[in-house]
Regions:
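Short, intrinsically disordered linker segments that flank or connect zinc-binding domains
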Residues: 1-4
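A detector for small-residue-rich transmembrane helices and their helix-helix packing motifs
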Residues: 6-20, 26-194
Length: 194
């Protein structure tokens, strides 16, 4: 005997309990709330800011660990805190570091996006993630989660594009993206008279 199919779900927009067969949510009016493209795990990330920030931090941490594991012999284990647990340049280049050299010599324009998720040391990763966790909730509160992610991504691309135009040979990190979030928060405060 088969188990009965669950016919209730949370509306992807307002998060109230509704029937999966509803043509539209009776609370918020969202059309076809039971459709698979509106109610899946990937899109669910964009409804919970804490879950999204945890996922974004997890991607940064996972790529950092992967960059360390790609070449364990090139690992920086010195006593200098700025270089402790630092991956080598070849690992970072393989994963998508950007700059004049990767873009001009290897034609990796996609690295303008990927470099925001790579970090040069444990301290670099730690400071970027702490700043992200402090600033992103404010930006999410004022602009919304999707706009915060757009500002973060486009800020990273813009920062790395400026680095490329300035001739920086090799660059990584989420600092440009985090600074874009700071700029968005400052703009919001200034435009509201703060």
């Amino acid at each position: 005997m088969t188990a009965p199919r669950k016919n209730s779900q949370l509306c992807p927009n307002c998060r109230r309990l509704i029937s999966r067969d509803e043509p539209s949510c009776p609370y918020c009016g969202l059309r076809s709330p039971g459709a698979w493209w509106k109610n899946n795990g990937v899109l669910r990330l964009f409804h919970d800011p804490d879950l999204f920030l945890t996922g974004l931090s997890g991607v940064n941490i996972a790529l950092f660990v992967l960059s360390l594991l790609l070449n364990p012999r090139g690992l920086g284990l010195g006593m200098n805190p700025f270089g402790f647990l630092s991956p080598d340049s070849r690992s970072l280049l393989l994963l998508g570091a950007t700059g004049a050299m990767p873009i001009e010599a290897l034609h990796r324009w996609w690295s303008l996006v990927s470099a925001s998720y790579l970090h040069g040391s444990l301290l670099h990763l730690l400071f970027n993630l702490i700043a992200l966790r402090q600033i992103a909730p404010l930006v999410i509160q004022e602009y919304g989660l999707a706009r915060m992610f757009s500002i973060y991504t486009l800020g990273g691309i813009g920062g790395f594009l400026l680095s490329y135009l300035a001739g920086v040979p090799f660059t990584i990190g989420a600092s440009a993206a985090v600074c874009a979030l700071i700029g968005a928060a400052l703009y919001y405060g200034k435009s509201r008279g703060g």
